[in-house]
Amino acid sequence: MADQLTEEQIAEFKEAFSLFDKDGNGNITTKELGTVMRSLGQNPTEGELQDMINEVDADGNGTIDFPEFLTMMARKMKDTDSEEEIREAFKVFDKDGNGFISAAELRHVMTNPGEKLTDEEVDEMIREADIDGDGQVNYEEFVKMMTSK
């Protein structure tokens, strides 16, 4: 997971980590974790912080070393990227910005050059994604469709 980070990201994370490793022993306390992550532009909730700490702090001693921290940040960034990509994709389909993708909007995008789908295929896509049966796809339905592989 951490091997997907760039050298620049690793350097940035090391700098932030070092700022909070007050005694220079290579560990930060769980209390400091939230501050570190916020300094890097992440905004985890208390619950998310606790989950991350529990996942990473294998020996339960309440501290996190740098390799564990890198793994955790790589996971957090991957999740954020995915969410943003899905949100951007939703906006592409939701032409009128009303929070729903209608069959007409989907048809417009999917019948552009390179995507040639028939009306039947477009209707089938809507039916598969349309969990509440209202004939269009809302954001939650879109997320489910995009993440269920």
From Swiss-Prot:
Residue list for modification N-acetylalanine: A2
Binding residues annotated for Ca(2+) 4, in chain numbering: D130, D132, D134, Q136, E141
One of the record's GO molecular function terms: enzyme regulator activity
Signal peptide segment: none
Keywords, in A-Z order: Acetylation, Calcium, Metal-binding, Methylation, Repeat
Superkingdom of this protein's organism: Eukaryota
Record-listed Ca(2+) 2 binding positions: D57, D59, N61, T63, E68
Any Gene Ontology CC annotation: cytoplasm
Record PTM N6,N6,N6-trimethyllysine, positions in chain: K116
Additional observations: This protein has four functional calcium-binding sites.
Function as written in the Swiss-Prot or TrEMBL entry: Calmodulin mediates the control of a large number of enzymes, ion channels and other proteins by Ca(2+). Among the enzymes to be stimulated by the calmodulin-Ca(2+) complex are a number of protein kinases and phosphatases.
Record family assignment: Belongs to the calmodulin family.
Name of the protein: Calmodulin-2
Gene symbol of the encoding locus: CAM2
